[in-house]
Amino acid sequence: MVRDKASGALVPADMETFKAYMPELFAGEIQVDIEAFTPLIDSSDIGPQIWEQVARMVVSHYDEYDGFVVLHGTDTMSYSASALSFMLENLSKPVVFTGSQLPVGVLRSDAKENLLTAIEIAAAKDEDGNAIVPEVTIYFEDRL
């Protein structure tokens, strides 16, 4: 979410705007690719149809990535993560949900810390090359 300059209301941030606020996403050792839903959806409007779309996206790209991060609003994040944990059983890769209490453009936003750590968790492997957290999780406010 970002604040609309004209109205002052919070609106979903398109990926280009999001990238502009977080250039460090693409400056690290971890390759980050972004897939966005169109139109962007407020988390209060998310339900079974969207859960299915997220699950299908993970399944369709499962062999291409070491892990997945789902940016999600806080209203229904726990419901979505729970639903996906049942839809994506027996994972060998992480699917990490995260979001923020404050929009990415706000000075003290927790968005950067939450997202960067979620990406690190999604990419983390043990000494044998296996995912450290091979399940659906939520990373939020310094807690996994």
Residue ranges and their predicted role:
Residues 1-144:
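Active-site histidine-anchored catalytic micro-motif
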